[in-house]
Structure formats: structure tokens, C-alpha cells
């Protein structure tokens, strides 16, 4: 009798379990709960101990020098001036000479205060009598500026840029302090101009040859100035070397052996060395004074 009751109870339990399973299976599955982000709490002691990302080092003024061998075999020295630097246009004792001597402070020799910050110095453009462009220094127009000519423009703070005068240069409200013009663009929009291939357009050369000492100045997309020179090169050689080093625009500077010069120091105020192999003048020429205009590159004062 007891055994039958146990079997009946077990059967009833089996029915209930089966019904429960059937009912559960028939019911629609509940929609999954939407996941929510879980905040992770970091103890103050651990947060304080977590390493912090180091700030990037502050940029330093420097000159990066390289050599570029062009398609026709010319070797061009290229120097890029980067970091916090300032530029100063200097009057030469002979050109512009007396026309600017009583008006400007930056004369034929690098001054003492400037010497302590001097990172590099390089030659300017043609003699003003060559008619290659105008000249303004420290707000004084020594030779009239001409529209359509490539120009190095330096503002009062020492920042520099290169552009075509009268074509977006100067910009409205731009504080022009010094301007050095020299011929037409050598590089424009990151390419040598068509005129770069016609060497006869780029000044009278010593001996009337195409391959002579030449120099040029370009600017890259970051605003850095790039100087290029060779003791034996064509205008197109300089243009192609500058483009390979990132120049978007460039101008030819002076030509012929006596005038092409780049002197650089490893650190601001350090000993200068001649950077263009075969350049004619000694590395201290601009320190003792020079007859032609030139540009100094200084470590920024601020």
C-alpha cells in the first residue's frame, strides 16, 4: 500500500514537472536586458601611482645639412633651418651700402648681441644695380619693390616667408619689416618653374657658363626656410634639390664664386664653419663685415 502511494506521488510529481517544463517552453523568451557600461573605480592610491605621459620635448633651433646629387651630377648643399629661429637682413658696406647705412641697425658686420644667438648666415641677392628687384630694410625702402617678383619678407618679430610680391604678399595687415627681391620664382607649387630650365634668365655668370656657383632659398609647407648652394650647378639643379627637400616655393639668390656663402654653427653662438664645399670666403666673413647684403639665422630670443 505504501509502495503504491509512493508511485502515485512520483507520477504526480512527474506530471507537474512535465507541465512546468511545457509551460516554460511555450512562454516567449524574455528580451535580453540592455547592457550598460560599468564604471571602473580606481583607488586613489593606484591612480596616483599610474604613470603619466611625458610631454614632448620643446623644439630647439637647429640647422640640418645634407647633400643632393642631381640628375646631371651636380652636388648641391641643402640646409633647413627649423625650430624657434629669427631672421635678420643685413646691409652690405658696398651694396646697398651708403643708401642704407644711416637708416638701419643691421650693418655689414654681425653685432655682439646677435653673435651670441647666431646659428647661420648666408648670402643675399644680386647687386641692386642689376635690376633684379627691390630692397627694403627695417621699414626703409632703399630700392622700390616691384610687383610680380619673388620676395623674401621678414616681419618685425624676425619671422620670414617667401612669396610673389603683389600676389597675396603682403597679406592685408601684414607687418612688413624687411624685403629682399630677386628675379622671378625658381620653384612654385612644389615644382621647378618652366623658367628654371633656361639658365640664361638667371643672371650673368662668370665666364658665361651654365654651371657656376649659385645659391637659392626656398620654403616648405611648414614655413621653414631652406637654403641651397653649389660651387657648380645650374638654376634647375638648385630648383630640383630644393623640391626634393620639400620646398613649395623658392627664389634664386646670388651667383658666382665670390658671393655664394653659407656658414653654420653647431649651437647658437658657436664657432662657424663653411658649409658649401669650395666656397670662396672664410666662415667668419660676416662677423668681420662684408660688402654685400646677407641674412643671419638666430636662435629665437623668446
Model-predicted segments: where are they?
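Bacterial N-terminal signal peptides that target proteins for export
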Residues: 1-11
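A short catalytic or substrate-binding loop motif that flags glycine-/basic-rich loops and adjacent residues
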Residues: 6-7, 70-73, 143-146, 208-210, ...
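Zymogen propeptides
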Residues: 23-144
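Conserved hydrophobic/aromatic beta-strand scaffold that supports enzyme active sites
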Residues: 76-80, 151, 185, 216, ...
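Aspartyl protease catalytic domain
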Residues: 92-244
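Extended C-terminal subregions enriched in glycine
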Residues: 163, 188-189, 205-302
Amino acid at each position: 500500500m505504501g509502495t503504491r502511494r509512493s508511485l502515485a506521488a512520483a507520477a504526480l510529481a512527474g506530471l507537474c514537472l512535465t507541465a512546468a517544463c511545457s509551460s516554460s517552453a511555450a512562454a516567449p523568451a524574455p528580451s535580453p536586458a540592455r547592457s550598460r557600461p560599468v564604471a571602473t573605480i580606481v583607488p586613489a592610491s593606484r591612480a596616483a601611482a599610474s604613470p603619466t605621459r611625458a610631454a614632448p620635448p620643446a623644439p630647439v633651433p637647429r640647422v640640418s645639412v645634407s647633400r643632393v646629387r642631381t640628375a646631371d651630377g651636380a652636388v648641391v648643399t641643402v640646409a633647413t633651418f627649423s625650430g624657434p629661429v629669427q631672421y635678420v637682413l643685413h646691409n652690405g658696406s658696398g651694396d646697398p651700402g651708403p643708401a642704407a647705412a644711416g637708416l638701419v641697425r643691421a650693418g655689414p658686420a654681425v653685432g655682439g648681441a646677435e653673435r651670441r644667438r647666431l646659428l647661420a648666415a648666408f648670402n643675399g641677392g644680386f647687386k641692386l644695380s642689376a635690376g633684379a628687384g627691390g630692397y627694403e630694410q627695417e621699414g626703409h625702402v632703399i630700392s622700390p619693390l616691384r610687383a610680380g617678383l619673388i620676395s623674401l619678407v621678414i616681419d618685425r618679430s624676425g619671422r620670414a616667408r617667401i612669396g610673389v610680391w603683389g600676389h597675396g604678399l603682403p597679406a592685408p595687415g601684414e607687418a612688413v619689416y624687411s624685403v629682399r627681391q630677386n628675379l622671378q620664382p625658381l620653384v612654385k607649387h612644389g615644382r621647378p618653374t618652366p623658367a628654371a630650365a633656361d639658365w640664361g634668365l638667371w643672371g650673368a655668370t662668370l665666364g658665361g657658363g651654365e654651371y657656376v656657383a649659385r645659391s637659392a632659398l626656398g620654403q616648405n609647407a611648414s614655413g621653414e626656410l631652406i637654403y641651397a648652394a653649389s660651387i657648380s650647378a645650374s638654376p634647375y639643379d638648385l630648383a630640383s634639390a630644393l623640391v626634393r627637400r620639400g620646398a613649395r616655393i623658392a627664389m634664386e639668390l646670388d651667383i658666382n664664386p665670390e658671393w655664394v656663402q653659407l656658414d653654420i654653427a653647431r649651437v647658437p653662438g658657436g664657432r662657424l664653419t663653411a658649409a658649401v664645399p669650395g666656397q670662396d670666403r672664410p666662415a667668419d666673413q660676416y662677423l668681420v663685415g662684408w660688402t654685400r647684403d646677407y641674412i643671419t639665422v638666430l636662435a629665437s630670443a623668446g
